[in-house]
Amino acid sequence: MGVYRSGVDSGEVPQWYWLRGLHDALVLGVETQEFAYDVTQRKPVRNCMVIRLDARGALFDTSVTAIRLYNYKVLQGAELKGCHWMQDRLRREKDKFILDIIAPGKNDFLYSVRFDFAEVERK
């Protein structure tokens, strides 16, 4: 199992990962899509979550505008819209990734989502 933390050089990380960190990026919104199950594909894409970011105020990586998580399942969390991204941890368990996002609020909270693969939009 690999564990990757933004801002820490922790060895081999997925090419799409924002290694320098998104601290203080603003979450503009979260969109979800469901797709028809395609039985002809070996690993069909069933759904997608898009996390839209304004990273202009982020301390390190200001280029990320959106993160797409495919075949996702939310494990824990509340509404991310309007929150500032404080830190994250990306884990790999078997053939899935788990992204834990810590966002400040009344009490810092954890948003955790499992997914198969991701794409990151950068400006």
Regions found by a protein language model. Give the residues of each.
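Surface-exposed, interaction-prone regions used to assemble/regulate multi-protein complexes
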Residues: 1-123
